[in-house]
């Protein structure tokens, strides 16, 4: 899309909607996507949910729906959220992890986003005008107050920052 004038042809359309930045970024614009479930016989109709989810949950959720047992080594990080997808409850995933283009990790809970420190530059250099979200210091955002990730609260909420850093470390360590 970059050589075919897609950027120019989009005009004022923002592909990442209300979120900051876009694809390749550590910000929400790089990972937040709508998830649409359409199944007239099985899913609640006309409902929307802001429950946190992850595409990594597809194997466990679809296996449950299909009554297929996954082996312990299969889809290790996948969680069954089929009842949330079908609108039968609103239970969100506890957290989701994303990786930006330079391999820096983010940990997203229902209301907060932690972006791990990174030595990458502030903008993508090879293509679109996209903020990377990379900084040499940890970042923490309250997404319930600003989906655009405007105010870094890492210094104001050190205990929450440490808790999310520890959780990301545990997940990376396989715990």
How should each PLM-predicted stretch be described?
Residues 146:
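Intrinsically disordered, low-complexity polar regions and short flexible loop motifs
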Residues 168-175:
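Bilobed periplasmic-binding protein-like "clamshell/Venus-flytrap" ligand-binding domains
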